[in-house]
């Protein structure tokens, strides 16, 4: 079994701030089970307490993939930017929302969750802490800074 997630080294917000906010979101919104903030390339920035490290990383990778596919569809069909992506499963709902520049907020809900309320609370969280949710893009072709 994996140990609980501790993303302290990856955060752009002060230690614990994103985790606390994600835990609060999961506790307040009926049906929510998990929440994760991720960079657009799928790195975990913050995660709710009930997620193991392995599960947080898996959810972030899945959310990044769906969000990227939706952005590609938006570009191809000239439909504009992606605000939200939703995947409805037999007993769960995955919602991914753009959150700041280069980041996403992904939540996993039971199928009993109120999608409208979940989306509303996600938007409130993103608005409240948008500057903390921004994740700088990784530059692949740039050499590491010397210090």
Regions found by a protein language model. Give the residues of each.
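Acidic, low-complexity cytosolic segments
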Residues: 1-32, 41-147
């Amino acid at each position: 079994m994996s140990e609980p997630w501790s993303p302290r080294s990856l955060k752009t917000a002060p230690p614990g701030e994103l985790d606390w906010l994600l835990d609060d979101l999961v506790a307040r919104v009926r049906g929510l089970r998990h929440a994760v903030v991720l960079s657009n390339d799928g790195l975990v920035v913050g995660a709710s307490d009930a997620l193991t490290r392995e599960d947080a990383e898996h959810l972030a990778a899945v959310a990044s993939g769906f969000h990227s596919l939706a952005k590609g569809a938006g570009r191809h069909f000239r439909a504009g930017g992606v605000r939200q992506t939703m995947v409805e499963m037999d007993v769960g709902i995955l919602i991914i929302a753009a959150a700041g520049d280069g980041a996403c907020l992904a939540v996993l809900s039971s199928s009993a969750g109120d999608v409208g309320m979940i989306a509303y609370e996600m938007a409130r969280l993103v608005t409240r802490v948008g500057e903390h949710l921004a994740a700088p893009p990784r530059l692949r072709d740039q050499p590491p800074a010397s210090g």
